């Protein structure tokens, strides 16, 4: 079904966005945390 492909695509985009946001947050914390 088409909606399954849509949900899968949204999930993939969300996963990549989450990884990018987490990576940016980790970089910020490691650089200026302490």
UniProtKB/Swiss-Prot annotation:
<dbReference type="InterPro" id="IPR022731">
    <property type="entry name" value="Dermaseptin_dom"/>
</dbReference>
<comment type="function">
    <text>Has antimicrobial activity.</text>
</comment>
<dbReference type="Pfam" id="PF12121">
    <property type="entry name" value="DD_K"/>
</dbReference>
<keyword id="KW-0964">Secreted</keyword>
<keyword id="KW-0929">Antimicrobial</keyword>
<comment type="similarity">
    <text>Belongs to the frog skin active peptide (FSAP) family. Dermaseptin subfamily.</text>
</comment>
<protein>
    <recommendedName>
        <fullName>Dermaseptin-H5</fullName>
    </recommendedName>
</protein>
<dbReference type="GO" id="GO:0006952">
    <property type="term" value="P:defense response"/>
</dbReference>
<keyword id="KW-0878">Amphibian defense peptide</keyword>
<dbReference type="GO" id="GO:0005576">
    <property type="term" value="C:extracellular region"/>
</dbReference>
């Amino acid at each position: 079904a088409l909606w399954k492909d849509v949900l899968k695509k949204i999930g993939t985009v969300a996963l990549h966005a989450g990884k990018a946001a987490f990576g940016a947050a980790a970089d910020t914390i490691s650089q200026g945390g302490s």
